[in-house]
Amino acid sequence: QVSAGRALLGLLVGGGLGLFLGLLNGSSKMASTLLDTTLQMIRNIPALALIPLVILWFGIDETAKLFLVAVGVFFPIYINTYHGIRSVDPQLIEMGKSYGLTRWQLYKEIILPGAMPSILVGLRFSLGLVWVLLIVAETISAQAGIGYMTMNAREFLQTDIVLVGILLYALLGKLADVLAVTLEKYLLRWHAGYQK
């Protein structure tokens, strides 16, 4: 329960920010010019390489764990959202404008549906990545969670509990993937590639 809460909160913070900046940079050339190259530079730094800095900044409390997970899931969602927005057919947007659609209607009816397959790929990738990051984050002086349980069991050479921890991470990852696929099928039910 503690691990799932950390994963969900990290996904909401990092994923929400990634979605917002992906939409912003994908839609605005000025925002893209100002922000995208900086974000791409930061993306090349592995999230796990930030651990010493995160401990210096946030200590070893929940904020450090949340930050690591959020940074890790930010980039898959950001990149896929940015790419999805940029790859929407410009002719469809022009056609929408010629029909008198407002900017909000263009987003709702053309841009977001066109970018949705790419956005959901980013979400699915992030849902897999969140558990990897959480394993590492929970080894940073956690007092609860699967990572804490596993590290504690390692200290006492309890192989069975370590294996249970690994199995729990695998099951949570599988559950997250099933939820992502279900969400894909629901949100893309109009898309020919997702129809039964």
What residue spans do the PLM features occupy?
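Membrane-helix interface segments
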Residues: S27-L35, D61-A64, R103, Q158
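Short helix-to-coil transition segments within interhelical loops
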Residues: I85-Q91, M95-A115, E155
